[in-house]
Amino acid sequence: MTELSPKYNPAEVEAGRYQKWLDADVFKPSGDQKAKPYSIVIPPPNVTGKLHLGHAWDTTLQDIIIRQKRMQGFDTLWLPGMDHAGIATQAKVEERLRGQGITRYDLGREKFLDKVWEWKDEYATTIKEQWGKMGLSVDYSRERFTLDEGLSKAVRKVFVDLYKKGWIYRGEFIINWDPAARTALSDIEVIHKDVEGAFYHMNYMLEDGSRALQVATTRPETMFGDVAVAVNPEDPRYKDLIGKHVILPIVNKLIPIVGDEHADPEFGTGVVKITPAHDPNDFEVGQRHNLPQVNVMNDDGTMNELAGDFAGMDRFEARQATVAKLEELGALVNIEKRVHSVGHSERSGAVVEPRLSTQWFVKMDELAKQAMDNQETDDRVDFYPPRFNDTFLQWMENVHDWVISRQLWWGHQIPAWYNAEGEIYVGEEAPEGDGWTQDEDVLDTWFSSALWPFSTMGWPDTDVEDFKRYFPTSTLVTGYDIIFFWVSRMIFQTLEFTGRQPFQNVLIHGLIRDEEGRKMSKSLGNGIDPMDVIEKYGADSLRWFLSNGSAPGQDVRFSYEKMDASWNFINKIWNISRYILMNNEGLTLEEAESNVAKVAASEAGNVTDQWILHNLNETIAKVTENFDKFEFGVAGHILYNFIWEEFANWYVELTKEVLYSDNEAEKVITRSVLLYTLDKILRLLHPIMPFVTEEIYAQYAQGSIVTAAYPTVTPAFENEAAHKGVESLKDLIRAVRNARAEVNVAPSKPITILVKTADSELEDFFTSNVNYIKRFTNPEKLEISSAIAAPELAMTSIITGAEIYLPLADLLNVEEELARLDKELAKWQKELDMVGKKLGNERFVANAKPEVVQKEKDKQADYQAKYDATQERIAEMQKLVK
């Protein structure tokens, strides 16, 4: 056994440890066919750059789960990997090239892709280094990438199979267009923001000049693509105009007036301009009336030749020029300033342009129905918290067909080929013969990511061992911000191609926010690099903060004050471990376990040993229960309270009564309980703080704590009598300490302590453990009896089953003591009100477990006894007031 260094230094503790784990292969599946499999696939981070604090949180939660399951004897697999992140990564590489004065078009597709692969290799290395610093127990031998050959094969098969079923199709429709990235976007890649804008009201004159029809638009630059105006066929103001024509201003061409229910008589003037190539609703109107589709913009957001004098202008520049021209012509009625919702690209931030474009789509109705129906079966995906199941179902009910083609070079090139005759060939391999050209577009990144849970396991080969053993996966951990982007798509794609759910559970977490509750972003400059935090505090401190502040579905606020508290907690663990190991006298863990069994059987040890083992048992049960519910924050609070309050502040201090004695037999038992409890604490903590627990564990045990058994409840440790007795002992000691502090009596000054109790068992317990009372209260005189008369001038403390009097006549101010007792009385009244309200709730009494209801009734009786005793003491003290 070696000795821990005097001071906890996370840099020293964590240095080299991760590589030792990798060298020992402790992160790989056990291969034990008798063990139940448990698998997680990591949500693949984008190879766009370094990981942020949100990634640290996400992966910490996964590591906690997989480490605990590994210790519980499951055959665990945590499969790592990364996402090619098409549009985001391509944008980063293009930005780097622009700094060198180069565009992707200068390089050409092949050489540009070489540059992107270089970027990928660079940042994949960085990401893996960060994973190592976080201590993530992933199996690198199974690492995947969304563009590796295995996943590419799966992507091609899925595309071809859906195409053959008629669920992938190619067509010309209005889509969301990103003019900055020059690519199509799906609906959920568009972020809507309220912006200051305007409605421009314009007059379109009838062909005969008899009157004008007023229309309004937020995008007057699109008027060059107007092919009609629409009125409601039931609107009496315009019914007689249907079939006639108006003159399109500036362009001076005739366009028809059509009758269509899209025109709302109650909105505006009831007349709308129809621009089928630039508005989804207008596109539908155009389809119904067989109207032409006139696209007036280039793919970069500039106006094309159909805009006449405005050709080549940026769309926003053209907007102002168009308005000025309309005003010059007398066709502009007015400009109405208004805040309205405008779509922006989730990736580039550019204002999205609705644009007519030929794209590939996934038909969603059947896929969505399958996913929703599956949630009614035993094979459903369970969301934590459950409210996100409703979020998932609502999105599925309202989902539109998914545009999956992207006008990029980085990604899975669409497996479709065209020839001069206009034929389309879709297949997993290129068609035979000459004259075929592959579609230049690539698939939406989320198309390949949607296959992640099963493609990483070897699919489409369903006979490989990983697929048979580890699919479906057990748990997915991810943020609520990508339920639509990713979780939903994994569910419907996995169901379609495997007939199974992709994962049994989905743990949804929130976002990391700053101390003020703001979302972390580059624009606010409030982002935190997790590697900087680790450098200062260590990975274990960061992991403890991230888990301890975690509740399913909720956001977390980062603060350095909380990081200080995390470090202090680990430092406390370090110090008590060092104390225990320094006093261990060569005791082995096996010997400690044998001696602890004697304590459990009441063959050795004392009541404090039995008390800590009982509380350890309760802690193990509660922590395990909350881990199973993914309530890591609750589990963390339970661990913190047990370790700091019960173990360090009480039990370790209580053991000094034995360790500083001459009774060698008792010392061995006490050392055994200390080492045994410390060992269980380290195992409970290991999934959360792996580095420091491994460092301490190595001082007294063989092998790695990574594969040590996770603690389980030991029925023999249950000892309610010991628990009740020591809790009363703690209450007594605490009451005396508090009373000393109230009147400024130093702990070193001996005082008289009178303990009155009518409970004979409690009297016997206090009497038999008087050595502990004396050690912690420093009495000049200590009397424990049922026959004690309350002194006139004494401080009074009421604990369960006893009254404690401290005769401090020369120090006590009666009026101040009465004020203190009044506060005590108010406290007990508040507790009585709360428990009374709960017990007065018929639904609670009817639905709660009987033992829970009884616990509340016991509390009520206890609070009532304390209230009555306090009231009685107040009455006695009031007699002393002259």
Swiss-Prot record:
Protein name per Swiss-Prot or TrEMBL: Valine--tRNA ligase
Pfam families: Anticodon_1 (PF08264), tRNA-synt_1 (PF00133), Val_tRNA-synt_C (PF10458)
Sequence motif: 'KMSKS' region, positions: 519-523
Function: Catalyzes the attachment of valine to tRNA(Val). As ValRS can inadvertently accommodate and process structurally similar amino acids such as threonine, to avoid such errors, it has a 'posttransfer' editing activity that hydrolyzes mischarged Thr-tRNA(Val) in a tRNA-dependent manner.
Molecular function GO terms recorded: aminoacyl-tRNA deacylase activity; ATP binding; valine-tRNA ligase activity
UniProt subcellular location: Cytoplasm
Subunit structure of this chain's protein: Monomer.
Gene name linked to the record: valS
Enzyme Commission number: 6.1.1.9
Family as reported in the entry's similarity comment: Belongs to the class-I aminoacyl-tRNA synthetase family. ValS type 1 subfamily.
Domain notes from UniProt: ValRS has two distinct active sites: one for aminoacylation and one for editing. The misactivated threonine is translocated from the active site to the editing site. The C-terminal coiled-coil domain is crucial for aminoacylation activity.
Motif ('HIGH' region): 45-55
One Gene Ontology biological process: valyl-tRNA aminoacylation
Binding site for ATP: K522
InterPro entries: aa-tRNA-synth_I_CS, aa-tRNA-synth_Ia, Anticodon_Ia_Val, M/V/L/I-tRNA-synth_anticd-bd, Rossmann-like_a/b/a_fold, tRNA-bd_arm, tRNAsynth_Ia_anticodon-bd, Val-tRNA_synth_C_sf
Coiled coil ranges: 808-882
Keywords per UniProt: Aminoacyl-tRNA synthetase, ATP-binding, Coiled coil, Cytoplasm, Ligase, Nucleotide-binding, Protein biosynthesis
Catalysed transformations (reactions): tRNA(Val) + L-valine + ATP = L-valyl-tRNA(Val) + AMP + diphosphate
CDD domains for this protein: Anticodon_Ia_Val, ValRS_core
